[in-house]
Amino acid sequence: MKLVVCEAHLYINCVGEKKLLGATVTSDLKWDKNVELMTRQANINMKYLHSAKKFFHDTKILKQIYLTWIRNNVEFGAVVWHSSLTQELELKIERIQKAAVRVIMGNNYTTYDEGLQRLKLDKLSERRRKICLTFAKKSLKLKQFSKLFPLNDNDHNMLKRNGNRYVINQHLTERYKVSTIPYLQRLLNEDFHERKKQFKRILSPVDINVCYTAGKI
């Protein structure tokens, strides 16, 4: 993007898309182009996996090739764009891993879910969710980033059974609702509630009758 200064006026050339820090941003703020470029590169790199399959049948080696040369391509900058993906784009990205699992498993491939279980892999959508949550948690430890996730000081809210720990930015549009910051705020609250449930389960009183029965067995 070029800047042209003319006396008191500043002219900016408008472009339809721009690559910023590895992510392709378009003027409509959609991620179709970014996903297209990522999946295209991932499909190109799939040749490494197909070539390796001719010489290796060890799934550990093939899995490592996939993680190094293919999966990285479809996860770069995921924190920025994951929450705004349409279902169609999510499926397009997931198909990359599905194809890779089929190659790695070879004749042992039955279903995608079973392949993931045997290779100890998460679905890409779940991995992106974990990446986003990890980013949000790390941001809480940084002074500048933690300001994006203010604690909820509303006493009435905190007294509620499902009161949120972190403020969720109000939104007037669906686009802002699914954008990165509100999404990360919701993730932090979901994680807070989940950890609170786990803590309650640990502290919950043990059923004496169950213990007695187990002891007799």
PLM segments and residue spans:
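Short, conserved micro-motifs composed of acidic
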Residues: 1-16
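Short linear motifs embedded in intrinsically disordered, charge-biased segments
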Residues: 86-88, 92-217
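Non-catalytic, peripheral interaction segments enriched in hydrophobic/basic residues
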Residues: 17-144
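Surface polyanion/phosphate-binding segment centered on an Asp-His-Pro turn
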Residues: 12-16, 28, 33, 37-41, ...
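Short, glycine-/Ser/Thr-/acidic-enriched flexible segments
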Residues: 10, 26, 30, 185-187
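Intrinsically disordered, low-complexity regulatory regions of eukaryotic regulatory proteins
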Residues: 5, 56, 73, 151-153, ...
